[in-house]
């Protein structure tokens, strides 16, 4: 009941959607679905783990909304999308939503590359810090820099595998949680931080595909 009719999320019900709150909504929906869906259905004595499955309607609407509104240079807020408030907090929210969903792209946007490009442009040349604009908290270099580093640091995690998204149905995603669980288990066995992603066949370049040792 907090989701806006557009699919995005505001700070409270009735607020216009913002980038930071929509990212928080996407991440929260994913976490809730993971915990609610621990037990897969059983039909005729067989576990139904490998059949096409859809994201929840709420999550799908939020991701579609976000794909059309994504920006790396400002926190899209309100009808004019001119928000500079909580920009670095917002970018960390983008990173969380991207990682938790395993999405390389939001809409047509390679969110990590666009975010990195912008952060490198905004870094202070002498101190190496980041400083936010027109917002008291992020005007403190320590806060803005912390969020920037949280965004950038995940880019150093090796991509161990990727899902190849194709077609208009969900045949490519027979077991939505399978790769996520496999990577999580491998992390523990190897004692190393790893990540995975979904690459869209329409948007991904050859270099994008070559980043993943395994493509499923």
Q: Residue locations for each model-derived region?
A:
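An alpha-helical repeat/solenoid feature that recognizes helix-turn-helix modules
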Residues: 1-117, 121-160, 170-174
């Amino acid at each position: 009941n907090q989701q806006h009719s557009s699919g995005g999320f505001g700070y409270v019900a009735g607020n216009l959607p913002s980038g930071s709150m929509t990212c928080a909504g996407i991440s929260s929906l994913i976490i809730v679905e993971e915990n609610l869906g621990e037990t897969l259905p059983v039909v005729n004595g067989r576990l139904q783990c490998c059949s096409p499955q859809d994201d929840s309607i709420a999550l799908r609407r939020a991701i579609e909304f976000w794909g059309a509104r994504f920006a790396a240079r400002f926190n899209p807020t309100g009808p004019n999308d001119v928000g500079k408030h909580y920009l670095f907090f917002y970018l960390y929210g983008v990173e969380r939503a991207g990682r938790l969903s395993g999405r390389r792209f939001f809409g047509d946007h390679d969110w990590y590359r666009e975010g990195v490009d912008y952060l490198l442009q905004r870094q202070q040349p002498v101190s190496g810090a980041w400083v936010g604009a027109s917002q008291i908290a992020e005007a403190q270099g320590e806060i803005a820099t912390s969020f920037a580093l949280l965004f950038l640091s995940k880019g150093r995690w090796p991509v161990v595998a990727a899902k190849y998204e194709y077609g208009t149905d969900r045949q490519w995603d027979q077991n939505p949680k399978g790769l996520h669980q496999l990577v999580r288990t491998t992390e523990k066995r190897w004692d190393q931080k790893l990540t995975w992603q979904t690459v869209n066949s329409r948007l991904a370049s050859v270099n994008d595909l070559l980043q993943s040792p395994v493509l499923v």
